[in-house]
Amino acid sequence: MGLNCGAEDLPWDEINNVDCAFTSPPYFSTERYNEGGEKEELQSWFKFSEYDSWRDNFYLPVSQKTLDSLNESGIMMVNILDPKVKGKRYRSGDELVDMLKPYFLGQVGMRISQRPQGASVFKDEDGNFDKEAMDKFMKKIYIENVWCFSKDKTQDLFKHIRRGTLEDFI
């Protein structure tokens, strides 16, 4: 069965007994998938133009439904950064953990290379493209959060590397 819809419109009542769900939802409007393309109206950034609407009608409900779809020992991992739009940081990671705190197992950092930027970002003092500046930028390594959740709180994904718990930081 092929589906062509947003994640918030999936037939969630038919999705169950999932062992592992790994998702990297769009960072609100900072990642505009399929912009200008066919069916761009299905994208969450298009449907929900304000952060609160995106969070309340897409991001958190889909996260909850994904968790609900897990089997009793299933794991859900969510890779998301706090989006920054027009200078304002939206704490989507905190909102997710706050909502799913009873199921929170921990957080890991995913090491990634820098994402490409447009050539216009890398200009020298004369306004010309500066390849050396771009190459230096692209060699940087970043860490993105992966939040881990499960219905089974006896699971310990991090027992071999644990140095503290969430409670230690509260």
Model features per residue range: what roles?
Residues M1-D9:
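Conserved SAM-binding strand-loop segment of SAM-dependent methyltransferases
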Residues K84-I170:
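Class I S-adenosyl-L-methionine
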Residues N57-T66, M99:
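Short, conserved SAM-binding segment of the class I
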Residues D9, N17-P61, K84:
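Mobile active-site "lid"/loop adjacent to the S-adenosyl-L-methionine
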Residues L70-M76:
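Short glycine-dipeptide loop
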